[in-house]
Amino acid sequence: MPMSSPIGRLLAATFLFIAVAGSAHADTLRLGINDSPQNAAIELAAQLVKEKGVEVEVLSFSDWNTPNLALANGDIDVNYFQHQPFLENAIEQNGYDLVPVAYGVENKVGLYSKKITRFDQVKDGDTVAVADDPVNQGRGLHLYQRAGLITLRDGTGPKASLADITANPRHLKFIELPGPQLARVLDDVTLAQSYPSHILAAGTTDPGSALLFSRDEESGHLYALRFVVTSKNVDNPAVKAFVDVFQNDPRVRAAIAQAYGNPDLYALAWLPARKEASR
């Protein structure tokens, strides 16, 4: 059938539409995130990467479990909310085929209080808060140990749990909460583990006022957020284009700095340590 016929022209137009639509879908990136001060920078990067022909749909999740489930199910193409230990635990627990492909910002974690200013003011039987997921709970418990409030079993690593506490001389009562909620319980507990990013988002206190911060540099940026994809998507050019803009565009970097307002609350994990002071 000659393509000059009406049906031929219709088929040609249909094939062209499918080709264009398929190309557009290939360059449309569905990015899953959590509530974070970085979100303004993420949205800015999503606008800037349009110059490279990539459309980004940013989807925000309210918990720490759904972003990985959505990624594994193909509902999104990449997520950005978790550090390596959290990802490894999610893979172990759920069998996800997920791979980290790039570093993002590393958030400090701290012990916050609106009731005390020194750890020696903690009273016998006080209630304190930690994250309820295995990895972030361990990170918080190591802070409580550094503060001199508890002792953990020798050799306890990132997955320390309440069961690993071998000494609790002040008989602290630990409550376990989802990470994003920890910033909102400071009126109800003596101490709470929390991320400055969550404190910023909640507006409950000064994010720089933690009595103790983590020493993340010592872990080799183990707790930096990662851009994560499925294994079949590791070479996705749209992901690479977005990450390039997020990491290297000075406007995005300025948006990150403005969001945190304090360079001591975060690190740009993709940069050599010697450059971070000038971030």
Per-region residue spans from a language model:
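Bacterial N-terminal signal peptides that target proteins for export
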Residues: 1-12
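Beta->alpha turn/N-cap motifs
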Residues: 36, 60-64, 74, 79-88, ...
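Short, polar/charged alpha-helical segment
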Residues: 35-57
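A conserved helix-loop-strand patch within extracytoplasmic ligand-binding domains
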Residues: 101-151
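Ligand-binding "clamshell"
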Residues: 89-101, 114-116, 188, 193, ...
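Periplasmic-binding protein-like
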Residues: 138-145, 246-267
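Short helix-initiation/N-cap motifs at beta->coil->alpha
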Residues: 59-69, 156-184
